[in-house]
């Protein structure tokens, strides 16, 4: 992580919670969000004696930065005494110091409203030789208040004109005036009125408003990608100017550095768009170390038809850092995508948002055109996330090839990369298991059967299979037929079917034979017992009386 100075906050108790007869009290000072260690905390107790204790630094989970607390215990006439906590962070700067002055306890109070007003231009719209900035501090509970002016974050050593405090009812107000030369005001610096009150800081800032860009013309600066910065080691920044009207004049793009050091040679490209406008691109190689250390680069655009130059600047993103979490997986097969498979990669909880995503096939980087990645989006917390999607062919996944999703980010350690591998198995959905041997004969079975081997070629229907459009590996509705293949050799359930068929055949033959024998036996029995009567009857029938 890059060097980060601490934020300092006073820690006090509510006055109503401190006994009136207390002989000693404890107050604290919190320094948080700094990197690296250490910080040095000292106290100014005035005329009182006190003992201090600084707790060991703790690591903040999300950013990896540090926080520590220093405690001061004082005795004596502490109620009327102001105390100053002084925090120094040498890694940020040898002279970096933040002072917080506050009392032992906090009373209920109304905080002040801080607002900066500036003098207006003359009748011609021009700034006067001197500019007055007026800081109005109003609406606060009467009490000690301190006003300081800052220029680009640094305390200004100037004589200030501060009015006396006026009180209206239960609230008070005051004001402070700062006079600047026109040169300082036009230098694009930021001026801040900082008010310290009851151990808290309130402020308002102002600067000369940027001139509006010429209508229709826009300029943009892009930072180097993490891939170019940390992998290729050849970072570049790009200045893009769009919506220029073609003319005989020349568009000039000039690069510079805030440090005043020379810049590298840039490349330039002009392209005429379909709407008749001109787009100009200038690409500048930058030093990896210069960029990481926070150098600021500026692109200045001039053209005879522009009323004023356009200025754009870029530098390394500030703020906390967090390494990305990478998850790669294969999506389940879908009925309409038989010849391809989709791999997905979720990358989340990283800061800042600058990230590069690549896919590798058997450790060889794939072209960017083969995959698509979303723009970084904010999470519910303070981090960002992206999704990346890659389509692979059947031939690639049937060879058990390995695919790697790699994220390049400055907070990833030790090499600024985090990667996860995923392999697709034609035998198992999502698959990381080894694929099985492909069978070679085709049978048709109901989709209600489970655990059947896959159809020839994975999910492509076999020419001899006419039992439906489903696939053996797809867990579809039971009423759907699926095409599956029989493994080499005879399947166990084939012999079972033959045995059942033979048993049923023999049973039916036995049943028919038994019925036939029974009928023959009954017929013979009836013949032996009733022969005379039967003959008489037949005689009577054949020879009727005349």
Swiss-Prot record:
Residues 521-546 are cytoplasmic. InterPro entries: Ig-like_dom, Ig-like_dom_sf, Ig-like_fold, Ig/MHC_CS, Ig_C1-set, Immune_Resp_Modulators. Keywords: Adaptive immunity, Cell membrane, Disulfide bond, Glycoprotein, Immunity, Immunoglobulin, Immunoglobulin domain, Inflammatory response, Membrane, Repeat, Secreted, Transmembrane, Transmembrane helix. One of its GO terms (cellular component) is immunoglobulin complex, circulating. Residues 1-499 are extracellular. The basic structural unit of both sIgE and mIgE molecules consists of two identical heavy chains and two identical light chains; disulfide-linked. N-terminal variable regions of the heavy and light chains form the antigen binding sites, whereas the C-terminal constant regions of the heavy chains interact with immune receptors to mediate effector functions. Disulfide bonds join 15-105, 29-85, 135-193, 239-299, 345-405. This is Immunoglobulin heavy constant epsilon. GO terms for molecular function: antigen binding; immunoglobulin receptor binding. Constant region of immunoglobulin heavy chains. Immunoglobulins, also known as antibodies, are membrane-bound or secreted glycoproteins produced by B lymphocytes. In the recognition phase of humoral immunity, the membrane-bound immunoglobulins serve as receptors which, upon binding of a specific antigen, trigger the clonal expansion and differentiation of B lymphocytes into immunoglobulins-secreting plasma cells. Secreted immunoglobulins mediate the effector phase of humoral immunity, which results in the elimination of bound antigens. Glycans are attached at residues 21, 49, 99, 146, 252, 264, 275. PROSITE patterns: IG_LIKE, IG_MHC.
């Amino acid at each position: 992580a890059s060097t980060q100075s601490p934020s300092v906050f006073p820690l006090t108790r509510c006055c109503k919670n401190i006994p009136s007869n207390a002989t000693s009290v404890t107050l604290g000072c919190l320094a948080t969000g700094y990197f690296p260690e250490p910080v040095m905390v000292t106290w100014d107790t005035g005329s009182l004696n006190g003992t201090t204790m600084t707790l060991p630094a703790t690591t903040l989970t999300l950013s990896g930065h540090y926080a520590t607390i220093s405690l001061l215990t004082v005795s004596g006439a502490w109620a009327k005494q102001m105390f100053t906590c002084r925090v120094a962070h040498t890694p940020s700067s040898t002279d970096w110091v933040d002072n917080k002055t506050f009392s032992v306890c906090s009373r209920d109070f109304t905080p002040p409203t801080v607002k900066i007003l500036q003098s207006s231009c003359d009748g011609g719209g021009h700034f006067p030789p001197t500019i007055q900035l007026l800081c109005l501090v109003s609406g606060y509970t009467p009490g000690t208040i301190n006003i300081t002016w800052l220029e680009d974050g640094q305390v200004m050593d100037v004589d200030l004109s501060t009015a006396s405090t006026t009180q209206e009812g239960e609230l008070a107000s005051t004001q402070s005036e700062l006079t600047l030369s026109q040169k300082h005001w036009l230098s694009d610096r930021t001026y801040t009125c900082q008010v310290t009150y009851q151990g808290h800081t309130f402020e308002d800032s102002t600067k000369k408003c940027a001139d509006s860009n010429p209508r229709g013309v826009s300029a943009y600066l892009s930072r180097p990608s993490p891939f170019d910065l940390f992998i290729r080691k050849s970072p570049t920044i790009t200045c893009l100017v769009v919506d220029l009207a073609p003319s005989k004049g020349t568009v000039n793009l000039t690069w510079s550095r805030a440090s005043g050091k020379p810049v590298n040679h840039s490349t330039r490209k002009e392209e005429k768009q379909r709407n008749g406008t001109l787009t100009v691109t200038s690409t500048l190689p930058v030093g990896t170390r210069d960029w990481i250390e926070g150098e600021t680069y500026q692109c200045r655009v001039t053209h005879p038809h522009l009323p004023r130059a356009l200025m754009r600047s870029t530098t390394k993103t500030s703020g906390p850092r967090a390494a990305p979490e990478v998850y790669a997986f294969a999506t389940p097969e879908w009925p309409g995508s038989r010849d391809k498979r989709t791999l997905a990669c979720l990358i989340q909880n990283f800061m800042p948002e600058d990230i590069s995503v690549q896919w590798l096939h058997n450790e060889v980087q794939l072209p960017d055109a083969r995959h698509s990645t979303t723009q970084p989006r904010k999470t519910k917390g303070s981090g960002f996330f992206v999704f990346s999607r890659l389509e692979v062919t059947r031939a690639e996944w049937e060879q058990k090839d390995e695919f790697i999703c790699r994220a390049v980010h400055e907070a990833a350690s030790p090499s600024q990369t985090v990667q996860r591998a995923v392999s697709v198995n034609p035998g198992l959905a999502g698959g990381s298991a080894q694929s099985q041997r492909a069978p070679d004969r085709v049978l048709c079975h109901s989709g209600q059967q489970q655990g059947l081997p896959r159809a020839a070629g994975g999910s492509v229907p076999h020419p001899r299979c006419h039992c439906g459009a489903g696939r053996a590996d797809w867990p579809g509705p039971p009423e759907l037929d699926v095409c599956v293949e029989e493994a080499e050799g005879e399947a166990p359930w084939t012999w079972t079917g033959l045995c059942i068929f033979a048993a049923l055949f023999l049973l039916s033959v036995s049943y028919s034979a038994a019925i036939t024998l029974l009928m023959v036996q009954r017929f013979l029995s009836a013949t032996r017992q009733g022969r005379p009567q039967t003959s008489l009857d037949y005689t009577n029938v054949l020879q009727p009386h005349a």
